[in-house]
Design a protein with these regions (language model features):
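N-terminal small-residue-enriched
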Residues: 1-472
Length: 472
């Protein structure tokens, strides 16, 4: 990466009549392997390098990017971003919350460097997983295992004196399996992800995880019974807690969405200026605290500084059942009279940084998983989900269980076929009356923006109980 060229672009931007300028360079080595039913279906290996310029001038914001690494191109980018900013000026001028410049370097270390693992070994290890799945008595005719890897070097500078260098290896795995029993199919999808080296792949124990999923799907087909519709206690596994935290807390708390910036693409939020919900409004039981924390070590959503040069920290979104803090970039922070909390990310050099979640999860309580289930006289345990949807205000939502069981007198009984809960954000979080001590995470890819930016995140939390909710 030519950091001198990036610095040159910033110096040239400073020669313009600007309020603010920044440059951001990315160099990403990308590799992806796909195994489909025992065959290597795809192997991709690329290197993508480029940089972008963003300029604030006369209350307008301009952005330009390129993968051409020349001084002429740097000047062209600056001129283009500057012209865009001038043309975009409006009565309601854009401003950025004040921040001090930062000069630092940070990187994620690898115990087993991904660069040192030959492609042949990676393919062989994925093939071993597929072989283990195909050699079972359970019929698993559909098996897709994918392993995407990104090694990303970044360099960020701005007109306030920031110069931040970083290196992050991200390794992920996606698995789709289809189990067929007596002509009836059931499917499961699992995603794994870490900011780490190849040691993460070793630690996931994907074979056992996927075999467990296959056994559960088979049992659901054989023994799963429909739910008797009605109000009941619902115990949710960590996967369900995580998706609910992400969808009904994380997204509606994004400040750009709150201000209407996402309205034409993904909708808005039930939280908005002048509406019934705002900071300080109760949204759940006082035992409910949901945070978004980029600093969880080795997490899929890990970073130390965001893509506007702001130091990462834990953000309290719902605190003690109260709407507490929005996810901000510098623009939304200025608009709402506060400071950025380091929530601005871009997935590549040709994408503008926007407000994003990192690792969104419910904080632990003081119960054990066993105690929660033993305390239920009659209910449902929805350990994982197979589908979900939520409206464009992130208020009305629906979750369908994958691995689920009836609870009778504190014991798990027969499996339940696709139990459904349809509820609202406030009802969901107000119904929580027990939270486990143990937090678990699942990797996910959060979609947002136009052009789309799929950002690596964790969802998660403990096992929870929702008291007397309608399940069908």
């Amino acid at each position: 990466m030519d950091k001198d060229l990036v610095d040159y672009a910033l110096d040239y931007a400073r020669s313009k009549k600007i309020e603010y300028a920044e440059t951001r360079a990315h160099s990403t080595e990308f590799e992806q392997l796909v195994i489909k039913n025992g065959t290597l279906d795809a192997f991709i290996s690329t290197v993508d390098k480029g940089f972008c310029v963003r300029i604030l001038a006369d209350g307008g914001l301009g952005f330009a990017s390129s993968n051409k690494w020349t001084k002429d191109e740097a000047r062209i980018l600056v001129d283009r971003a500057y012209r865009s900013a001038r043309r975009a000026k409006r009565e309601d001028k854009i401003s950025f919350a004040d921040e001090k410049g930062v000069d630092t370097k940070w990187r994620v270390t690898q115990k087993k460097k991904i660069e040192d693992i030959p492609a042949e070994q990676k393919i062989a290890e994925l093939m071993e997983i597929d072989k283990a799945l195909s050699s079972q008595e359970i019929k698993i005719p559909g098996r897709i295992i994918s392993c995407p890897i990104r090694l990303t070097e970044k360099y960020f500078t701005n007109s306030e004196g920031s110069a931040i260098s970083s290196f992050v290896p991200k390794i992920a795995a996606f698995a789709f399996i289809t189990v067929v029993e007596n002509g009836k199919p059931e499917q499961a999808y699992k995603q794994f992800g870490r900011s780490a080296g190849w040691e993460a792949f070793d630690e996931w124990n994907m074979t056992e995880t996927l075999l467990h999923e296959a056994r559960i799907l088979q049992r659901i087909i054989r023994e799963g019974k429909a739910v008797q519709p009605g109000k009941t206690d619902l115990v949710c596994g960590t996967e369900v807690t995580g998706i609910a935290s992400h969808e009904s807390c994380g997204h509606p708390i994004e400040a750009d969405r709150i201000l209407g910036r996402e309205m034409s693409q993904a909708g808005r939020s039930f939280i908005y200026p002048g509406g019934p919900y705002w900071m300080g409004t109760r949204i759940g039981n006082d035992i409910v605290t949901i945070v978004d924390d980029p600093t969880v070590k080795s997490s899929y959503g890990y970073y130390e500084y965001d893509d506007e040069g702001i130091k990462a920290r834990r953000r309290y979104l719902y605190k003690d059942g109260i709407i507490d803090e929005f996810l901000h970039n510098r623009e939304t922070a200025a608009k709402l009279g506060t400071r950025s909390n380091g929530s601005s990310r871009a997935t590549n050099y040709d994408r503008e940084a926007i407000v994003r979640m990192a690792n969104t999860f419910l904080l632990p309580g003081d119960w054990t998983d066993k105690e929660i289930i033993e305390d239920v006289k009659h209910g449902i345990f929805m350990k994982s989900f197979t589908e979900w949807n939520i409206d464009d205000r992130r208020f009305n939502q629906r979750y369908v269980g994958r691995e689920a069981f009836v609870i009778e007198n504190g014991e798990l009984k027969h499996p339940v076929a696709r139990p459904i809960i349809e509820t609202t954000t406030k009802t969901w979080w107000s119904s929580v009356d027990a939270i486990s001590k143990k937090v678990e995470f699942d990797a996910a890819t959060c979609g947002k923006g136009d052009p789309m930016q799929g950002a690596p995140v964790y969802t998660g939390g403990p096992v929870i109980r929702l008291k007397e909710v309608y399940v069908r």
